[in-house]
C-alpha cells in the first residue's frame, strides 16, 4: 500500500504477521498491550490505531504468506477430551480467559465480553 494514496481496501484491524506501520504513526501509538502473551495483541493494536483516527488498508498485492493454524492442533478440535480442550484453550496459543475477556471488553464493550467469553466453554462442554 502506498502511504500517500488511497490504494487498497480499508479494514478494521490487522494480523501483524505482515504489517507496515509508518514511523510517524508508530511513534503516536502505544506499544502492544502487555495483557497479551501471544495472540490478540496485534488485532488489538490495529483497533487502537483506528480509534486514534488512522486508516488501515489492505494491500492489493500479496506481500507474504502465512499458513493457518489447523483446527486439528487446537482447542477447537472436537476429537480431544474436554479436559485437553480446556487446557489448550487456556494456553497462550488458545484463548486464555483473562486475555480474551480483556480483548473483548476493550474492543467490543462489557456485554459482548461477558457473552463471548462464555461461548468457548459452551463449545467445549457441548463438544462443538
Regions found by a protein language model. Name each.
Residues 2-3, 22-27, 78-81:
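A short alpha-helix capping/helix-coil boundary motif
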Residues 2-21, 85-89:
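A recurrent flexible, glycine/aromatic-enriched loop bordering the glycosyltransferase active site
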Residues 13, 27-64:
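Donor nucleotide-sugar recognition loop
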Residues 21, 44, 99:
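Short Gly/charged-rich anion-binding patches and loops
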Residues 52-82:
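Active-site donor/metal-binding and catalytic loop motifs
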Residues 71-72, 76-128:
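Non-catalytic, C-terminal membrane-associated alpha-helical segments of glycosyltransferases
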